[in-house]
UniProtKB/Swiss-Prot annotation:
It is an enzyme of class 3 (hydrolase). It comes from Pyrococcus abyssi (strain GE5 / Orsay). This is Translation initiation factor 2 subunit gamma. Residues 46-50 are annotated as: G2. It catalyses: GTP + H2O = GDP + phosphate + H(+). Residues 9-203 form the tr-type G domain.
Length: 411
């Protein structure tokens, strides 16, 4: 049994979302033992910039019935039983990194909204992240009322009432609110049980053509590696349907940029999968859930520094279409989210430039046409997406991009 457990892949992605400094990364560490801020700049500034992934095994103690992520029950010392493996996506809570958070949100099967008990609720990014979950239609939400060790009972209850008021009428209206201390590991068992109860593993059809959204891409070769020892580029992301196998031929869309008559165009590319990594293990097959590393025969120059982020991977000829322009059915929010003062969302104007998040891709769109609740946008970078997919729409307000609504891709 032990060996089988080792190669288990995470079967759901759970987003850690919320305002900067409310304890998302600390909570991820309490659940997984992994500190997801590994970027040097992140450690220096103490905030998450890139999206971090960390896996945990949800386990139940057959003796006392409590849940944990540990092989030995922290409450009674009995050996625990494996329930399932989950992957936590630690998304940035800083306002300037909202578009990164939206890319991560497209991979989430559920979310834990972390709200600090020692600050008034909602803070700007708390509201913004909840809106992002609303926009992508994510209803599997748990609220972790964190830093409970810093407040007395009265303050905790007042904060609880503020949270209840804040979530009324939103996708999180019926979300459980669980008081915890991520720092001291208090009430983590209750949170883990809530994950079991409220964030189910989605039913997936393994026979659908594979589709993976690329979030990161790397050149893993150290400087000075001799040419014969160089390995191909690596794509990091999450499979949203189907499965990938070592040896598969894959297509990547929209692909790589090239110049033609002074204009940048994109060309899909095909390559072969030479290795697959999931949950820190090399595997022969990878499925939806968790971060998957796909080793390819691509020139690592194409994949260095996240250059391939936003692409979609699948079987040649089986991927969604690539769009240079989109027709969107638009749903605007009443007010701009993320700003300290409340601003009304003005209607979209012709020739306005918007920032669009489509899956893990982000692109600028120039508004070329307006209709009733519809817009047409010409894209700076093409995207690979299905009709019916949701697109998050942000507008530049001051020096920041602010979420103002979403669009649904029309044929």
């Amino acid at each position: 049994m032990g060996e089988k457990r080792k190669s288990r892949q995470a079967e759901v992605n759970i987003g850690m979302v919320g305002h900067v400094d409310h304890g998302k990364t600390t909570l991820t560490k309490a659940l997984t033992g992994v500190w997801t801020d590994t970027h040097s700049e992140e450690l220096r500034r103490g905030i998450t910039i890139k999206i971090g992934f960390a896996d945990a095994e949800i386990r139940r103690c057959p003796n006392c019935g409590r849940y944990s992520t540990s092989p030995v029950c922290p409450y009674c010392g009995h050996e625990t039983e494996f329930v399932r493996r989950v992957s936590f996506i630690d998304a940035p809570g800083h306002e300037a990194l909202m578009t990164t958070m939206l890319a991560g949100a497209s991979l989430m099967d559920g979310a834990i909204l972390v709200i600090a008990a020692n600050e008034p609720c909602p803070r700007p990014q708390t509201r913004e992240h909840l809106m992002a979950l609303q926009i992508i239609g994510q209803k599997n939400i748990i609220i972790a009322q964190n830093k409970i060790e810093l407040v007395d009972k009265e303050k905790a209850l007042e904060n609880y009432r503020q949270i209840k008021e804040f979530i009324e009428g939103t996708v999180a209206e019926n979300a459980p609110i669980i008081p915890i201390s991520a720092l001291h590991g208090a009430n983590i068992d209750v949170l883990v049980k809530a994950i079991e109860d409220f964030i189910p593993t989605p039913k997936r059809d393994p026979n659908k053509p594979p589709k993976m959204l690329v979030l990161r891409s790397f050149d893993v070769n150290k400087p000075g590696t001799p040419p014969e020892k160089l390995v191909g580029g690596v794509l990091g992301g999450s499979i949203v349907q189907g499965k990938l196998k070592v040896g598969d031929e894959i297509e990547i869309r929209p692909g790589v940029p090239y110049e033609e008559h002074g204009r940048i165009k994109y060309e899909p590319i095909t390559t072969e999968i030479v290795s697959l990594q999931a949950g820190g293990q090399f595997v022969e097959e990878a499925y939806p859930g968790g971060l998957v590393g796909v080793g390819t025969k691509l020139d690592p120059y194409l994949t260095k520094g996240d250059l391939m982020a936003g692409n979609v991977v699948g079987k040649p000829g089986k991927l969604p279409p690539v769009w240079d322009s989109l027709r969107l059915e638009v749903h605007l929010l009443e007010r701009v989210v993320g700003t300290e003062q409340e601003l009304k969302v003005e209607p979209i104007k012709r020739k306005e430039v918007l920032l669009l998040n489509v899956g893990t891709a982000r692109t600028m769109g120039l508004v070329t046409g307006l209709g009733k609740d519809e817009i047409e946008v010409k894209l700076q970078i093409p995207v690979c997406a299905e009709p019916g997919d949701r697109v998050a729409i942000s507008r530049q307000i001051g020096s920041r991009w602010r979420l103002i609504g979403y669009g649904i891709i029309k044929e």
